[in-house]
Amino acid sequence: MQHTRRMLNPLLTGLRNLPARGATTTTAAAPAKVEKTVNTVTILGRVGADPQLRGSQEHPVVTFSVATHTNYKYENGDWAQRTDWHRVVVFKPNLRDTVLEYLKKGQRTMVQGKITYGEITDQQGNQKTSTSIIADDVLFFRDANN
């Protein structure tokens, strides 16, 4: 658990890895019970803006957003589309550099990783809950006309 906390600290200025949504943190020499858990997410969508390099020189991180859509059909036959925006962070050095150099706004991409929660303090001092996907892999797709 300490490794995860150290890894998330440099994410953004003001980002704190705090327990959220029922999460708890425990510290002990050995846990009372060891069991396997799974925190895996895969999204396929379009990049909202060119990736940005953030963090510090010692702890760089690349962030970008991905839009996914859900289509709905109403009883009257009309269609609606809901867009969800996902915040993606990349810590892995080689993946981070590749994403920063090659991934562009509007490009179709698939991200595999895990979900993490925390809080961000904005410039006015207000705290907001932050949900991010820590990328383990990012796949790039080219449009047929490119």
Curated annotation (Swiss-Prot):
Which NCBIfam families does its entry note? ssb (TIGR00621)
Quote the InterPro entries the UniProt record gives: NA-bd_OB-fold (IPR012340), Primosome_PriB/ssb (IPR000424), ssDNA-bd (IPR011344)
Output the Gene Ontology cellular-component terms. mitochondrial chromosome; mitochondrial nucleoid; mitochondrion
Range annotated as the organelle transit peptide: 1-22
Q: What happens when the gene is disrupted?
A: RNAi-mediated knockdown in the testes results in a reduced number of paternal mitochondrial nucleoids at the nebenkern stage of spermatogenesis. However, the clearance of nucleoids at the elongation stage of spermatogenesis is unaffected.
Spell out the molecular function terms from Gene Ontology: enzyme activator activity; single-stranded DNA binding
Q: Which gene underlies this protein?
A: mtSSB
The UniProt entry lists the main location of this chain as mitochondrion
State the UniProt keywords alphabetically.
DNA replication, DNA-binding, Mitochondrion, Transit peptide
**GO biological-process terms attached to the record:** DNA replication; DNA synthesis involved in DNA replication; DNA-templated DNA replication; mitochondrial DNA replication; mitochondrial genome maintenance; positive regulation of DNA-directed DNA polymerase activity; positive regulation of mitochondrial DNA replication
Name of the protein in its database record: Single-stranded DNA-binding protein, mitochondrial
**Origin species:** Drosophila melanogaster
Superkingdom of this protein's organism: Eukaryota
Summary of subunit composition and partner proteins: Homotetramer.
- Role description: Binds preferentially and cooperatively to pyrimidine rich single-stranded DNA (ss-DNA). Required to maintain the copy number of mitochondrial DNA (mtDNA) and plays crucial roles during mtDNA replication that stimulate activity of the gamma complex polymerase PolG1/tam at the replication fork. Promotes PolG1 activity largely by organizing the template DNA and eliminating secondary structures to favor ss-DNA conformations that facilitate PolG1 activity.
Read off the HAMAP family from this record: SSB
Has keyword Oxidoreductase? no
- Annotated effect of mutating F91A: No decrease in DNA synthesis by the polymerase PolG1. Severe decrease DNA synthesis by the polymerase PolG1 and decreased DNA binding
Could you say which tissues express the protein in this record?
Answer: Uniformly distributed in the early embryo. High levels detected in the anterior and posterior midgut primordia of stage 12 embryos. In larvae, high levels were detected in proliferating tissues including the CNS and digestive tract. In adults, highly expressed in the CNS, digestive tract and ovary.
UniProt subcellular location? Mitochondrion
Changing W85T does what? Reduced DNA synthesis by the polymerase PolG1. Severe decrease in the stimulation of DNA synthesis by the polymerase PolG1 and decreased DNA binding
